[in-house]
């Protein structure tokens, strides 16, 4: 154990926190090109076909990104914007595609939580 005098001279170091979204490199979002669009199954106990795309980012990283919402128009070579945010039941998927920007269309017929899915306000 360190003495008080040693701690006065050199205080204890806090370990550096590791980022969960390293590929963003401290940016809020990053642009990239879809290299593969596919569906995958979640971990137990869930069951579904989750829509995922593999994205080559402008900084050279290649990451898996979840496509939220019902239906999408993405295919290979689509340009997308990704943000941080993991999908708990898909191992290795730590990013979300931003709906309603670049080549990714918003979710049509969305009434609630529209801003999260890039949906315009419906005409009343």
Curated annotation (Swiss-Prot):
Residues annotated as region Disordered? 1-22
Question: Which PROSITE patterns does the UniProt record give?
Answer: RIBOSOMAL_S12
Entry keyword set: Methylation, Ribonucleoprotein, Ribosomal protein, RNA-binding, rRNA-binding, tRNA-binding
Q: Which Pfam families match?
A: Ribosom_S12_S23
Record-level GO cellular component terms: small ribosomal subunit
Q: Name one GO molecular function term.
A: structural constituent of ribosome
Question: Which interval of the chain is the signal sequence?
Answer: none
**Modification 3-methylthioaspartic acid, positions:** 89
Read off the HAMAP family from this record: Ribosomal_uS12_B
Q: How is this protein organized at the quaternary level?
A: Part of the 30S ribosomal subunit. Contacts proteins S8 and S17. May interact with IF1 in the 30S initiation complex.
The name this protein carries in UniProt is Small ribosomal subunit protein uS12
